[in-house]
Amino acid sequence: MAENKDMCVRCGEGVINIRVGAIITKDNHVLMVRNNRDNYFYSVGGRIQFGETAEQAVKREVREELGFEMEIDRLGFICEAYFYGTIGDKQERLIYEPAFYFYMIVPDDFELESKTFLEDGSPEYLEWVPFDTEKTVYPEFFKTELNNPSRETKYIVADERSVK
């Protein structure tokens, strides 16, 4: 049996989920992922595995999800998020998710083709989403921050604990 090395652990009644995201942009669009189960888009990326750095993890996730190697341009955002969701046992619980979002260098010969599936086997789809979309995207700060990229790393807190 394969060992699960994902840095996602139960903590009391909640979950700590440490992840990375790839910021892949082109012509005022960002490459996002969607699936048939959820009604929102999410960033290319996933959980850091134990023993990986965030940089190693984002490169691995890009390779797994896109079937393509990309180099990192820079760390764009560190985001601490608290939200309610389901992971693993499908029971809704509070999730604390520190995430590192990296701007990637998009090669000239990059072609869009999704290579991944969800844990339940359903496919994921890649789509270029306009920065100013009305669609629901996570992380939400992509809608405001990607229009005006900075060379500095930004720290963001997204706290949805009071939403429930």
Language-model segment annotations:
Residues M1-G21, D27, Q91-E92:
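Acidic, metal-coordinating catalytic segment for phosphate/diphosphate chemistry
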Residues G14-I16, K90-P98, L118-P123:
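A generic structural micro-feature
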